[in-house]
Amino acid sequence: MIPIYNSPFAVETAHIKFHKSDVSARIIRSLFDTARQYRESIDVYGSKQSFEWPLIEGEEPVLHTAKKAEPEIPAKVKVPDYAHRLPKEIQRFTTKGVYGEGEDHLSFTQGGGHGGSHPHLANEFIQALLAKREPFPNARQSANWTCTGILAHESAMAGGEIRKLPAFTLPA
């Protein structure tokens, strides 16, 4: 599997500090040769609330809230499907992807890709073009999100060396 993923690591973890915020995140991707389900996940930690991606496919994520009694801190939450906000023709792509033959990798089949975000991102981009406005995410934000993953992998390949995002990806 190493040649397929161009990585000697079956699992990669990135620890991220958000710009001008007390929020940090842990991103985990388990790819191969591990006794667990395939997983791409993000856990976000803040001083008031924290969000943890489900450990098992099909389970619900957990929202932790500070200043509660210990047993009440964690609560499973349902993440709503916002397909109804999309044009009818693409609503079905938020829960399961429809791809060509041979494209059955779990990153495609679990929720249409990244939790069903792909149709929302595509629709937002098209709507922004039609309205002649900047989309969300814009080019800088998209570069920030993409570079985060690239730099996380580079960091792993360099023994965990800290990597900083390039200036063109940071808020103006």
Regions found by a protein language model. Name each.
Residues 154-158:
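Charged/polar positions within long, soluble alpha-helices
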Residues 94, 99-110:
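A hydrophobic C-terminal alpha-helical subdomain
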Residues 137-141:
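All-alpha amphipathic helical-bundle segments outside canonical DNA-binding/catalytic cores
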Residues 142-149:
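Conserved beta-strand->loop/alpha-helix structural units within folded catalytic cores of enzymes
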Residues 1-81, 85, 109-111, 118-135, ...:
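Contiguous beta-strand/loop segments that form the cofactor/metal-binding neighborhood of enzyme cores
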Residues 125, 142, 159:
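Hydrophobic, well-ordered secondary-structure elements that form the walls
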